[in-house]
Amino acid sequence: ADSLPFKSSKDKHELSHLYETKIKNMGNAGRNGGQYYTPRPLIRAMIDIINPQIGEKVYDGAVGSAGFLCEAYDYMYKRMEKNVDNLKILQENTFFGKEKKNLAYVMGVMNMILHGIEAPNIKHTNTLGEPIRDIQEKDRYHVILANPPFGGKERPEVQQNFDIKTGETAFLFMQHFIKSLKAGGRAAIVIKNTILSNSDNASIALRKHILESCNLHTILDMPAGTFTG
């Protein structure tokens, strides 16, 4: 590893590409990487629609391999005016995230460093362990981009942190993201499509909450096989 080039932005870009290819291949082989990898064309399409701007804070509460934050960095860097102030804002006060799992946390931080984010603002913590009623204005973000885990089953003590109690991990994350979004902010979130059809009380309540609390722009139903792993 000591012999690898790591000086120029081109070197870092090549290394980051190799790193993400390795994560993707892990997912294709059915190993751990598939839990943390969202297809990059999908991420880029979501970011194009959201159009994050310099000065806005971008958040992912289920960071995984940090694909959303890395792609948002690339998007904003290419489009912003290159000056000292903007570069400082982009590096230090733009990208934020949380990740519970040890491997995912390490993978995400490393991916951000390889993309050029020198000191990632990623917390190693359980996002769902934080009561949403404690989220204040200072804790909110202009942009949220995420693909929270599907199919998890959360314990009752975790469910108590949310207004709508459900064991479905992704549905708790959705509540967290809504609460964490600034007024007038934008979010693009990948979530299982059963949120549209489940007839249990929690799913009905969550759909009602989304329609009443958010300005819902688009629902895009992806075909089978979109995700690896």
Whereabouts are the PLM-identified features?
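Short glycine-dipeptide loop
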Residues: 181-187
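Acceptor-substrate binding/catalytic loop of class I
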Residues: 195-199, 228
